[in-house]
């Protein structure tokens, strides 16, 4: 029988050495699910609360014993003997048990670890892979799954690194690949080429939190030039095989007192409109098709201007802006702000809510990108979520560090298993990509 007979939680460590939560769910019939949750460093102010101990005698206050104890007592007792296949019912029980808007009583980390473990136990009970079970929960009718195109963060800055770059992520996107396996190969080759480019210039190859290189460079343009050079040295073509994407994490750059965006590495500051012009110039020159958090989460006027200026030719992603929250996404839809959402399950705190946000975004014409966090674990749930919802895109770092490659390896296995029942999202299906490619190819024209 699929009734829950036990839930066990423990404190483990993530890729930064910080504690996080892992949970097991066991059923009467002997099936079980195991899941752990990640943690971010650059946080949106309205993310669901990650419960920490704040006991500075352990892990500088970052321990999660409170969360573990809540799962092993309160949550466990509330879910015993419930059918493990009742995902939405179980998630609702935990959300109501918490009783707050931001999950501050039980903690989003507590609820999500159990929520994902529930799904894995249910998938095991039903004899299907997790992505197929998620597709069933999501209501996907097609038997053909879209494999997500990876957005690979190969150079880190901002809060993800101890260097001088203000832009937080510089990503390569292998849109010209035929399948996920080739996309991963391209990402690996370009990353190694970038290492050689940096080495030959005597530039540090130290790594940031997400495994990308974290050099000190004279400007963001120079960073993009080096990435372009690494693409060329890998025998790929920018604007054909590969395009670029950036995460500005602009909330970290926004100076509230002046209302300006401060780029310390280039010793300049911009108004909202000037920052849009700056980003537009970079995009046109370096074939950047996607800009994440190109304005502060508090600067809705700036985000509206960004969307008005670039929304028809680029993918404009809301991360801190939306924090995987349906109410904030609805506000963005109503105000015509951004055209894409980054989906981080731990920002909202349950699988059911995550799937509902993806559905809302897609129904509203927003593209969806399922994403990791800077502090990751070996859990591969986001790969299954990306496939099970045919999200289209995934962010899970460079092809380096096992907490990142575990997701890539999971995608390789899924694609191999699905064979003809999968298609790679690729160049023809990404929002506004064709328009951006045209702009890049005609960048010298006066248009």
Curated annotation (Swiss-Prot):
Cofactor entry: Mg(2+)
Subcellular location: Cytoplasm; Secreted; Cell surface
Protein name, UniProt field: Enolase
GO CC terms: cell surface; extracellular region; phosphopyruvate hydratase complex
Domain of life: Bacteria
Family, similarity comment: Belongs to the enolase family.
Organism of origin: Blochmanniella floridana
InterPro entries: Enolase (IPR000941), Enolase-like_C_sf (IPR036849), Enolase-like_N (IPR029017), Enolase_C (IPR020810), Enolase_CS (IPR020809), Enolase_N (IPR020811)
SMART domains to which the protein is assigned, alphabetical: Enolase_C, Enolase_N
Binding site for (2R)-2-phosphoglycerate: 168, 344, 373-374, 395
């Amino acid at each position: 029988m699929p009734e829950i007979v036990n839930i066990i939680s423990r404190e483990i460590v993530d890729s930064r050495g910080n504690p996080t939560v892992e949970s097991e769910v066991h059923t009467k019939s002997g099936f079980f699910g195991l899941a752990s949750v990640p943690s971010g460093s650059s946080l949106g102010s309205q993310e669901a609360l990650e419960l920490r101990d704040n006991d500075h005698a352990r892990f500088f206050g970052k321990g999660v014993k409170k969360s573990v104890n809540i799962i092993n007592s309160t949550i466990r007792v509330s879910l015993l003997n419930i059918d493990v296949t009742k995902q939405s019912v179980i998630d609702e029980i935990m959300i109501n048990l918490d009783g707050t808007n931001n999950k501050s009583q039980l903690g989003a980390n507590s609820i999500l670890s159990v929520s994902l473990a529930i799904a894995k136990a249910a998938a095991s009970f039903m004899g299907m892979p997790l992505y197929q079970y998620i597709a069933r929960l999501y209501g996907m009718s097609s038997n053909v799954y879209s494999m997500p195109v990876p957005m690979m963060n190969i150079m880190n800055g901002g809060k993800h690194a101890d260097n001088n770059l203000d832009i937080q992520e510089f990503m390569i996107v292998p849109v010209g690949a035929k399948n996920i396996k080739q996309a991963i190969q391209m990402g690996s080759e370009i990353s190694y080429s970038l290492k050689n480019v940096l080495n030959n210039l005597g530039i540090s190859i130290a790594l940031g939190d997400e495994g990308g290189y974290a050099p000190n460079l004279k400007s963001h343009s120079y960073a993009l030039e080096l990435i372009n050079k690494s693409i060329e040295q890998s025998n790929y073509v920018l604007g054909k095989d590969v395009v670029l994407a950036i995460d500005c994490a602009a909330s970290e750059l926004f100076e509230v007192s002046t209302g300006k965006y401060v780029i310390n590495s280039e010793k300049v500051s911009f108004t909202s409109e000037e920052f849009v012009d700056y980003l537009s110039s970079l995009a046109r020159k370096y074939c950047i098709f996607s800009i994440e958090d190109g304005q502060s989460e508090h600067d809705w006027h700036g985000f509206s201007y960004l969307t008005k200026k670039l929304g028809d030719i680029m993918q404009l992603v809301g991360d801190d802006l939306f924090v995987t929250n349906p109410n904030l996404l609805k506000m963005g839809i109503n105000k015509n702000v951004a055209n894409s959402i980054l989906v981080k399950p731990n920002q909202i705190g349950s699988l059911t809510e995550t799937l509902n946000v993806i559905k809302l975004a897609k129904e509203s014409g927003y593209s969806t990108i399922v994403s990791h966090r800077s502090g990751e674990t070996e859990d591969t749930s986001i790969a299954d979520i990306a496939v099970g919802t045919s999200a289209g895109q995934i962010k899970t770092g460079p092809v380096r560090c096992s907490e990142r490659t575990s997701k890539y390896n999971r995608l390789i296995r899924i694609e191999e298993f699905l064979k003809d029942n999968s298609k790679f999202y690729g160049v023809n299906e990404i929002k506004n990509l064709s328009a951006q490619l045209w702009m890049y190819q005609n960048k010298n024209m006066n248009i």
